[in-house]
Amino acid sequence: MREHQDMATHNKFGKWGEDTAVDYLHKQGYTIRERGWRHGKFEIDIIALSPDGITCVFVEVKTRRSDEVALPSDAVDEKKMRNLGIAADVYVKMFDIQEELRFDVISILGSTAENMQIEHLEDAFNPVLL
């Protein structure tokens, strides 16, 4: 029972992080196209259109309560980057995306709006080069 509660808390915290990232992107002028887009076992947290309208941005959101163990962005390892690239490739083909493509990471450190820090790493990686 305890493990189920811990997972529920973890999922709720992750959703809070994604909601926070969406709010942040809106304030920066991005248009959100998709949230939690899935294809098979692959998922993209946020798919957005850049403020200038020329770039389709695939965003991985990582949230941590503290940086005692590691920074949130450290959780985006090579496997995660590759999987995000595979999912993005499917999305681009499925929806005939013509814009330029970019892969970003939004790192949220903290557990409330009052104590959080947001770091937006634009063009954080290129899955083709992995």
Task: Say what each PLM segment does.
Residues 1-36, 114:
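Acidic-basic catalytic patches of nuclease active cores, encompassing PD-(D/E)XK
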Residues 25, 44-48, 53-67, 84:
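Conserved catalytic cores of phosphodiester-cleaving nucleases, focusing on short active-site segments
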Residues 28-29, 40-44, 101:
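Short beta-strand or tight-loop elements
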Residues 37-38, 49-53, 97, 110-113:
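Short polar/acidic secondary-structure junctions
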Residues 41, 56-58, 100, 118:
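Structural motif
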Residues 65-86:
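Mg2+/Mn2+-dependent nuclease catalytic core
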Residues 94-130:
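Domain-level recognition of nuclease-like catalytic cores that cleave nucleotide substrates
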